[in-house]
Every structure is written in C-alpha cells, then in structure tokens.
Amino acid sequence: MAKTSQAEGQPYKGYYNNKSQGQPYHGYYSGFNKSASAQIHHLARSLTQGVQSHYDDTYTTATMHPNGINPISDKTDPTLDPESPSFSSKRWVQNMWKLYQSDSEYYKPGKLGVAYKNLRVYGDAIESDYQTTVSNGVLKYARNIFNKFRKDNDDYSFDILKPMEGLIKPGEVTVVLGRPGAGCSTFLKTIACRTEGFHVADGSVISYDGITQDEIRNHLRGEVVYCAETETHFPNLTVGETLEFAALMKTPQNRPMGVSREEYAKHVVDVVMATYGLSHTKNTKVGNDFIRGISGGERKRLSIAEVTLVQASIQCWDNSTRGLDAATALEFISSLKTSASILNDTPLIAIYQCSQNAYDLFDKVIVMYEGYQIFFGSSQRAAAYFKKMGFVCQDRQTTPDFLTSITSPAERIIKPGYERLVPRTPKEFYRYWRRSPERQALLEEIDEYLDNCENYDQKQKIFEANNAKKAKHTYNKSSYTVSLPMQVRYIMKRYWDRMRGDIIVPLSTVAGNIAMALILSSVFYNLQPNSSSFYYRTSVMYYALLFNAYSSVLEIYNMYEGRAIVQKHREYALYPPMADAIGSIISDFPLKVVCSVLFNLILYFMVNFKREPGAFFFYLLISFCSTLFMSHLFRTIGAFTNSLAEAMTPSSLLLFALSTFSGFAIPVTYMLGWCKWIRWVNPLAYAYEALISNEFHGRVFDCSNIVPSGFGYPKTGNSVVCASIGALPGEFKVDGDLYLKLAFDYSYSNVWRNFGVLMAFIIFLFGTTIFFVQTNKSSISKGETLVFRRKNIRKMRKMEEDEEAYMDGMAPLDFSGSTEISDYSYDYMDRKLLDTSNIFHWRNLTYTVKIKSEERVILNNIDGWVKPGEVTALMGASGAGKTTLLNALSERLTTGVITSGTRMVNGGELDSSFQRSIGYVQQQDLHLETSTVREALKFSARLRQPNSVSIAEKDSYVEKIIDLLEMRTYVDAIVGVPGEGLNVEQRKRLTIAVELVARPKLLVFLDEPTSGLDSQTAWSICKLIRKLANHGQAILCTIHQPSAILLEEFDRLLLLQKGETVYFGEFGANCHTLIEYFERNGASKCPQHANPAEWMLGVIGAAPGTQANQDYFETWRNSPEYRAVQNELHRLEEMPGLASGEKEPDTNQAYAASFWKQYIFVVHRLFQQYWRTPSYIYSKFAMAVLCSLFNGFTYYKSQNSMQGLKNQMLSIFSMFVVLTTLAQQYVPLFVTQRDLYEARERPSKTFSWLAFIAAQITAEIPYQVLAATISFFSWYYPVGLYRNAVYSGAVTHRGVLMWLIMTLMFIYSSTLAQFCISWNQLADYAANWISLLLTISMIFCGVIATKDSMPKFWVFLYRCTPLTYLTSAMMSIGLGDSFVKCAPTEILTFPPQTPGVQKCQDYMGAYISIAGGYLLNPEATDNCKFCIMDKTNQFLDFMNISIHNFGRDTGIFIVFIVFNMAATVFSYWLFRVPKGNREKGSFFDKLPFLNGGGDTNHENV
C-alpha cells in the first residue's frame, strides 16, 4: 500500500474510500508521544485501530502477510510487536483485519450501523425549577412523588430532543456539533441506550441494523457504548492493571489459536498502551485529586484506551477531546478514522472545539440547536447548505466554527439582502430543514436501509458474531463476553490489586482490631468465675458482639466509592454489578476471617471466658457469622440507596434497634409488648443468646456477695443467700443455666437453632444485596435546568413568557453582519469602571521543584509585563509551565521555591495586599452551589473591595458588572451543580465576575478560560475579555486551543516551551508580527489559511510529531526583540512612582475587611447554605427525633427496679450512639466549604482562615440546640426520668438541667467533628477518627465497666474521657434522689436466723443500716423478702456517680467542648494554613492522610 506524498510528521488530512468494505485509508499521521526518543507511540481509538509508524518503510503488512499472522506467537515482524521501537499500531490493525478475514467463519467479524427516525426525547422536569430549602423541601418532595404518577402531562415534562432523523453506516465517522444545552450529550446517550433520567417518546425509531434498543440493552450492550467526558477509575490500581482487567473481561473465545486468555489480554494491553503513549505509565497508579498518580492528560488517554479494549461497534464520544491540545485532539480523531476505515467501526463524536483538519476527517455532521437537529448529512456539504440559506463564512473561520456560529444569533453573519429571508429561531431552522431536499433524500435512504436490514437478515449475523466471542458456559443472549465465574475471578484479582495498591487500609484494619481487642479485654482482664462477674461477662460479650458486627460499617462507604465505576463497566458490558458484589464479598472474606480470629482470640482468653475448646470455637463461629450478617446488611443498604446521605439515617436507626433489642440492654422479660416483635427479627438477638448461653451453660459460679453479711450474721445455713439472680437460700454457688433462665429467659437448647436463624439471615441479605445492586439505578439527572429561589420563579417564568410572545410576534431581525456582542455603554464613567494605571512586571523569574533527590527547573528566567488595557496571551503545549507561571506571579505556589527573579508593581516590591489586589480566574469553576449568582458576587465584592467603600457602592458596582458581563437573565438563579443549575458558559462568566466585582486594582489572571467550552462560547468569552481590556483592565490569560479568529482578541503573546520563553511580543494584525519573527528566524512559511497558533507550536516542536529546527529559547535571548523587552523592563523599574498616586489606607493589609465583618458575612453565608441544604438538616433532625423516640418508647416509663435502673442507665448510654452519626453527617458539609475556601477564597484573601473556622463553629450551634431540644422532649419524658425528680420536688429544675446537658452533648458532637476534619484531608478519614474516639470514650465512660472494676492502668482514660462527665451529669440528674422497688426476680428470699421467732426487721436491721436495702415483709418470721437497694443513689454510688457533682461534671464537659474548638483552630493552623511562601509545611506535605496527592508530573505545579 503506497503512502501519500504528505510530509512526514504532519497531521493527516486524509482521503478515504470504500469504507463499508473495510479498506484502509492512505495517509500518514504522527504518534501521540511527545518525546524525542526513537520509540514513538501513536494514538488509536479502538482495539485494532492504529496509525502509520513514524519511520518510512518500503512495504506494508498487507503485502508481507496477505492472510495476516498471529502477532502474539509470531514475533518475526517487529512492526507488530508493541515492545519493539518499530511497532506500528496501524500495521497491527491491518494485520489483525487480514487475520480475521482469512477465517471469517471462525472470527465472524460483524459491525453495526444505526438509523433513527422521528426520534424525540423528553424529560420529567420543567425548564426552570425552584431551589429546595428547609421550608419547602417536604412540599417539593411530595410534589415530585405526586408527579411520578401523572402520565402524559405536558405540564410536567419538556422536550430535550425534537423529532429528528439520521443514518450512520458502518465505517462512517460522524461529528455532532452544537453549543452546551443543544442536546449533543442527550443525543449520544440516546444512541448508546443510556436513557436514565429522560425518556424516548413512543413512535421513535432507532434501529441498529435491524436490532432494537431493548435487544441492545439486554443482549448486545457492549456493542454500543457511551464514553463520558469525565474520567472514573480506581485510583489505587496501576494503569496496566486497569487495562488488563478490561482486556480480560473482553477477551474473545475466538481469539487466535494456541493463545491463552492471559497472553491475549497482555498483548492487547501492550498494544493499546504503546498506541496511546501510556507504556511508560504501566506500573504507575492511576491516582485522583488526593492520590498521586498519572497526569490529567494521561488519565484522559487511559479512559480512551479502556473504551478501545471494549471493542464496541458504535462508540459515542462526549467531548472526549476536552483538555487535549489541538494537535493531540487531531490525532485522536485520526485514529477513530483509521478504526472506521479498516474495521468498519462507527464512532460518533461530540466536539466543542474542532479544528479544520479534524473536521476534514469526518464523513457526516449533525448540527444541533437547542434540541433541534437543523442539519444531518455529508460533512463536505454542510457549509454549502447554510451558505445557500443566506449565511456567510468569514475569512479564517473554520467550517465547524461556521456551523456552530449558525446557532448563535450574536455571531452568525447574514448575507446582504437575506436579512428577512433566513431563519432566526431554532424552530425556524428546524422547519427549514424539514422542508429541505436534503432531508427528503435522507428519509428515502433511511427507509431503504431499514428494508435492507430486514431483507438480508443482518440481525442474525450480528448475534452470531457476538456469540462467537463468548466464553464457554456463557448464556447465548448475554451481553457479556466471559461467564459469571470468570467475571468473579477477575474481579477478585482486581480487588486484591486494589488492596495491594493501598496496603495501609487492610493493615490498619487488622491493627485496629488487635488494638481494640487489647483495650477491651484489658478493661475486663481475667474475670473470676464468681457471681460478681455476671454483669461484666454479659456486658463484654455484648460489646464484643457489637464490635464484631459494626466492624463492617465502613463497607457502606465502599459501596458508593466504586459505584460509578461499576455502572460504567456495566454499560461497557464488562460484567454485571452482581458479579462485582459477589467478587468483593468473597475477596473481603479472608480479611474478615483474620480480623475476627485475632480480635476474638485475644478477647476470649484475656477476659477469661469459658476454657473449653468447643465453647471457644462456637463463640468464634457465632461472632464471625455476626460480622457476615452486618456486612451483608450494610451492603444491602448501600445497594438500595443512591447516596451516602440517604443511607445514613436508616442505617443508624437499624443499628440502634439491633443493638438495643439484642437482649443485653433490655432483657426479654422487660421488653414492652409493642416492640417485642423486634427481637424475633433481630439476628443479633439470636447471636447474643447463643453467645451467653454458650458461656454460662453447664457452669456453677461461686458467690461473691452474701446477704446478710457482717458481724453477727452467720456465714452458712439457710438464713443467708447469695445476692444474685438465680441464687437459692443456703447455696453459695449460682447455677449458670438458672441465671440465664431467670435473668434473660434464655436456654442453651436454642443455640444451634439460633445459629441456623443467623445463617438464614446471612443468606437472605446476600440475596437482597445481589438483587438491589443489580436493579438499582444511580441518581439520574433531570437535564440541564436553571434553578431559582422559589420567590423568583414566578417572576422569571413571566419574563420568559413575555419574551417568547414578543419573539413570536415580531418581524425577523435585521442583522448587520457584525459579530460584536452587545457592549455596555461607553460613556466616560463606564470606561473607567475597571480602569487601572498600575503596571505589573517581572524579570528573570526562575522556579524549581525538588522531585526525589533532583532539583528540577520548571520556569527559567521568564520576563514580561502586563499593562492596563492590554490582553496578553500565555501559550505553550501541555507541560510548558503556563499555569505554574500564573501561580508564581500571583503568589499561589503550593510547593517548590522561586530561586531568583523579581516581581514588581510600578517599580516597587509587592506588598501584603497584592493577592487581594489581583483577580485570578481559575480553570475550574469553583462556587458554592447553594448561592445565587447575585449573592456570590455581593459576597466577593463586600469582602474584597476596600473597607472605605460603602456597602451600597459595592452592591451598585456588582449590578454594573452583571450588565457588563450580560448576566441579568440568570442573576437570581442558583449556581447549583452541572445539569441542575448554571450551564458551562454561565459558570465561566460567574467565575470571571466574582473576580471583577472585587475591583482588582492591578490586573486579572485567567487560566484556560475557554477549556472545555464550545467554539462559540470560547469566542464569547474572548470577546468578553476584550471588552474588559477596553474598559481599562490589565489581563494575562492562558489559552490552549485558540482559532485564528480568537487570536485577534489578544494584544501580546508570551510563548513558553519547557518552562522557557521563546517569544514575548505583539501579535500584530492577523498575527503578522508573530509570524514575521519566526519566519525571520528560520521557521518554514506559515500557510495562508493555517491557524497561526497551531503553526507556531509546530515550529517550536511543541506539537506531537514535530521537531524544532533550533533552540528557540537561545534564539529569543539573542534577538533584538529580547533586548527591547529588557530596555522596557529597565524603564519600568526606574519609575517607582509611576501612576502610583497616594497610597490607600489599607495598602499593607492582607484583607480588605475587618475580622468581624469577615466573620459576619461568612456566618450569614453558612446559614444560607444550611437552610438551602435540607437533606443535611432533615437528616440531622430525623436522627435526633427518630432515635430519641425509639429510645424513649423502648424504655418507656422504666420502673425503678434494679434492672429498671440499668435500663435507664443504658437508655442514657444509648443516646451517645447518636453522637457518632451526627458528627459523621456534618463532615462532608465542612469539606465542601473548606475545598471552596482553600481553592479560591483563601488565595484571593477574601477572608481569613480564623474567620472561616469561627464561622463553621458558630453556624452549627443553633441547629444543634434545636436538634437537642427536639431530642430532649422525644426522649426524656417517654423514658420517665422526670418521675425520679418527683420525690425531691425538682421536676422543672431537673428537666431544665437535663435539657442543658443534652444541648451541650449535641454541641460536643459538632465540635468533635470539626476537630477531626480540620486536619484530615478526606471525610472518610475524619469519620474513622470520630468513630474511634467515641468508641474509646464509650468503653471508658463507666457504663460498660465501672472505675473500680478497671485495671489501675486504665483509670486515667476514665478521667480523661468527656463521656465520663457527661454520663455522670445525665445520670445524677436523671436517676438521683429517688426510691428503688425491686422486681419479683430481684427479691432475695431467706428465713431469719431463728424462723418463727425472730422478725425479719430484727434480723436484717443492722445490715440494712450499713448496706442499705429494704424489706418487703418486715414483720414476717418465716421467709424474709429483701431488696438490696432502697435508694437510687446506691446505684449511682456503685457507678461512682454523685448527684452533688453535677455542676463540676457539667463544667468539665464544657471545658472539653472549648478544648475541641481550640484544637480545631490550632490543628487547622498547624496543618493547613500557609506559612511563609508555602501553602503547606514540607513536613506535613508528606502525610498522606492530611493532604491530597496530585499528578506525578509537574505540568501544573
């Protein structure tokens, strides 16, 4: 196959023919790799797609191997070996295609096309919605539920895609063009059968060669895939492991003979990594925002490579070129063309910024306009269609830019004389298209295509081809390539790879279990076999059961961590979610076994439980089964719910119910009738009965306390009795089985029955986990809608109706042809709106970063300036140092050191107000999602403008900026999240506006303001930047993919290559000055219609596959332009007074506003966020109310018997369980605020870190007080603790004190959460610390074990635990100064010393006066009935609690709250506040649990 005459190394512009027959295209395109090494890797799109190698060969694989060879076993051809420097992915594809064709009966190649007709898509939402708040949340939720039952009601749905039609044959490459919100993503998702969140209307026809969408979903899912814009991967897997997993899941049964699955998978992984330039990252972790790994660009290529391995026939790519430069994006599209030409793949690609070279590779184009398809057809005829309509394509305007400009009224240019003839609205364009001859021809072609699919039975061929790939024992109609057992095996291997990649997690889990076993068992160390150990044996058994059960609680977090990835793999037909669930359960099993054995082995023997082998192994079996039960329960909850917030409340209530009704807190005989049924459906109750029956059965315990005892009382005989349930008069031993029967109503005969019930629950929950994980659909999007505050929604709808009526009734607009967007009035004051006379300049800026032991220079001697009224473009390839330079200039570096260079304003050094004197528009649009646009702008203006400016002036300035940036139509809209809130362009405008309202007196930095935007939005943003400069603003802006038209909006260019300057100067008209400079210095001539940006990147060797012909850094340093720059910098440095004027009073202040003003505004915003986050508030109140009510009515009006007092104590203790959930619920909210603050507001000096922390602490308190108040009334009175105050006549007083201590308890939970998250980067880590600290506190607070029973070593923890003082305060107020009345089973019965003669009161009088207690029959002479307690204070004394210490205990508890607040402030300052020129101290940067990771390379340091 001969090559074209195109120059080597230049991007292929290509000619294609006979696509449907699978013949390859003729041409050359360069590789993906940017290095100068001999091994150049090339980008490809599908498993067997590829490109021409970089060197020139005289013959191709097609001529060498007419029938193809097996490249896995035959290594004779180096061009087919991915480990060879001579590897050519294009030749590999050609060889594989020949191999498939050589035995088509075995390989059965088959591909799909798609035809759609009358396709209409609608969503269940309105085009604008109102924001959910605490006040309207319940009403809105009820309305949404009601609307789900309304059918075919247009009031509650809107069209996303209007009826459309198209035909894409196998081997054709199609581009989908349109602005954000046009429906491009919805169209691709519809074609890919991803219709969650919207509906395909009845009557719509979508045919994949005669196959329906239902058949695709159920039987051929992997043949049609959708690749989203974002990347989701397991961060702890390496690149090689990620791709190998996908390859194993898609390894076909009909692979080349003699090749194992593992060999095949390894080979294709090596091929795609070589193809995509990922070979060097094979053993590198993927990483994410918090775990170091590959770079963002490499992560994008990894996503592409993964889809490549799926081997889908129809691939729907949604803006997959985002973040790639123009040259790299071109190579990606070229690879898709290769795949289509050779293998008959059918890719559809939505691209927002498409170059002309890339566009020329497409066969067909779809143009979308606000849900209407206004053109479908040949990419070469699209421009002519709209030109014939009456529109003009400007000089240097690319065809895709022209096509998308048609959908923008402000940008399309109308041919003179056609002003009243061309369509204006989307509906008019749609009508024009539906009447066009192009559409009529398309409909005829679609009908013919559909008839042919039925006549030639193409459907059967596709199913046969799909079945040929499937492994043995795989269901014929399954979408998956390998069988379920194989899927589970590969998933288990992936799970272990993930565990190995983050080995600290399993090791810390094991270590945590050992530590908790040692702590718990040491508290109850070596219990003696006597009656005094009964309470401790049952309590430690209870706590051990709960620990074994709750050890799986974090699995609910894991369910959400990987859900997006599992759903993605399901859509790729790698495996069903049930396979992942089964695999993870089996993979978790060994770790559970190890943890369970270690914990229970240590606990069992240190506590001195029953020393019999059978008893030990039965204990181990029941404990482990309890762990499995709770694991499956948490997995079921996670599988059933769609978010962690949804799962928290039901899981917490279930935990509370299961632990309360396990049999220890409330024995069976004390359970109330209304809730006794819970015991029968509570597996932990069966487990607990089995455990303590196993412990007490067949044992006789010595008596440790005889009643009566002391001087004058006999030590033997029937007149004394053991003070224990189950004791008999005259007996000094207690039978274990009798104790169980009387105290718990338990019997040893039930232990194996209980084991069977426990296993039944495990099996049942395993089934429910599999069912829900397979059937649950993740949260769905409603489509892109604006969200307003409820009070503004009617006003906005009225405005929209008036505007629509006006547009429908008016005549067609008379366009002048100008592309200028509407501008703000240019009177003098408005021109001065952003005016500044300050000049920012820098010289010889050098920045280094230490990577391992190497000092790497990232920026090397950079010079430049930014003057008012000028827009300076900062350009270069990825990794050139653009963002790094912006961060260095704006003092935002988070690592590394500026080793030399100066940064000045008007010749003077930078002062402490510099950071708030500039605006920095970050690439990421970071905003608080609950704020409105106006609120976000006012917040920035009020805190960042000088304190001398009044609030009214600041607000007035905000309104001017709103008009300047044309944001008036959505100024009252909620920022929201993508899909429900502002769209991409609106978010970018808001990001710019937030910086402008601060009225930066120096300049504005913009980092990639057009990244991810469509070409028209990018053009709009650049026009906006130009407008700002015209108003006097100085601007420095990085830009990645500018078209020739966009470059006209910039005045100067700073061009970087590998951290060095290669040009700094003016663009000139039509970039003439720039072009002349490079051509004068040896560059090839710039073609007349070429994009100067792409040309200059190729000249300096920054584009893939290009090589610079000289060192342009040295060329620049020796040029006259460089000397002119140095002279100008010298002039600026010698003029320190230039336009500086009088210094403002706050010049040297880091913040414009005072601390108290900062604090007030931040607190106000926090209260707004809370009010507009009803899910958090509802969850908090639901937890407080439901748990309290459940607690209160579980222990409803507990009597003052000895068991009743224990019940009241455990009721108080159970309230502590709520603290963990309340604290963990708060953590994600804090993280949201902190991420915004640290990413945008702290670097811009909006407000101080102390104001941030103080506001966080303050904002929680009112809601905690309210939650505590509701909880108090829901619990205190149902339990009946108020009755204990009746005897002392202090019912009201003690009720108020109990409310006070409960309020402090709730406040403590929030301050503990704030302390734990203040120094932890991840919410999960903070949640673990919260759980650990509260668990230890609950062990040592004196309830599970009293102070006197603890080993002396642990007494210090008893005194240091805040819950000790909380328990003491609540129990003294709740139980003190009342009387005890024993239950019948608690009454000790024995005769006096001389029965029939001596009265009981005479016999027991001396004992009662010393030990307390009371007689029920003091006058009796035969059998004395004695209760060992008569006052509740005796019970408190046993617990080391005194009612007189309430004030002391409350005060100490308040000290703990204050300590948490102080520790929050100190730890945040220590670990997260920038110190000096560093964002975080070098020591703390090394602690992975404190700080995020990032990319291993330093493209954006």
Curated annotation (Swiss-Prot):
- What Pfam family is a match, any one? ABC2_membrane
Stated membrane topology is: Multi-pass membrane protein
Localization (cell): Membrane
Decide whether keyword Glycoprotein is in the record: yes
Note whether Cell inner membrane occurs among the keywords: no
Q: Which residues lie on this side of the membrane: Cytoplasmic?
A: 1-502, 776-1175
Sites carrying sugar chains = 530
Q: Which residues form the ABC transporter domain?
A: 140-395, 840-1083
Q: Where are the transmembrane segments?
A: 503-523, 540-560, 589-609, 614-634, 653-673, 755-775, 1176-1196, 1212-1232, 1261-1281, 1297-1317, 1325-1345, 1353-1375, 1451-1471
Family membership: Belongs to the ABC transporter superfamily. ABCG family. PDR (TC 3.A.1.205) subfamily.
Which NCBIfam families does the record cross-reference, listed alphabetically? 3a01205
For this entry, the protein name equals: Opaque-specific ABC transporter CDR3
